[in-house]
Amino acid sequence: VKVGQSIGYEDAGRTSLDKDGKYDKNIQDKDGTITNPEKGIPLNIKVTSTDKDGSETFTVTIKDIPNGGAIFVKEPLTGKDILVTYAEDGTPTIKVWNNGILEDYTGTTITANKGTITIEKYDNVNPPKFIPPHNSHGDFDLKVDAKTVDTVVIDGDPVPSENTTAIDKPIKVVVKDV
């Protein structure tokens, strides 16, 4: 797994578009409501493998997500947009983001606990996006775990084999003041 520094602004995911459809840092909900999660800060996480038969997938866990923050990610199996918010006490809520309407998430590919999100069948094309806590700037030090899951079929039954490839790999998210 390869990770790199990510950089963005404190209002990432919370700003709106102007009348011409352009990002405008001056248009935002003062209460910190997430209005444009797709404008979050992309996390620079890439997983690779030498396995070329298509039987291998990756499970990525992002840790140390701050209270009041959020992660926006595309669900790998359905393509639905998922918004995971973390309350001030760290309690996560997973919802489907349907053009601003929050719906219940009933899938199992994305799970969350206090300060963490786990994404099964991780997709490099759609990296998760970090939304910092409202009005927060500075550096956020997240950690990434990754494992490969290789599935073979034996006597008609799928048999998964897991191999941890990274534990607590640091990823710094620099959040600039606006």
Tell where the protein language model's regions lie, with residue ranges.
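Extracellular glycosylation-rich, acidic/polar low-complexity regions of adhesion-
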Residues: V1-V178
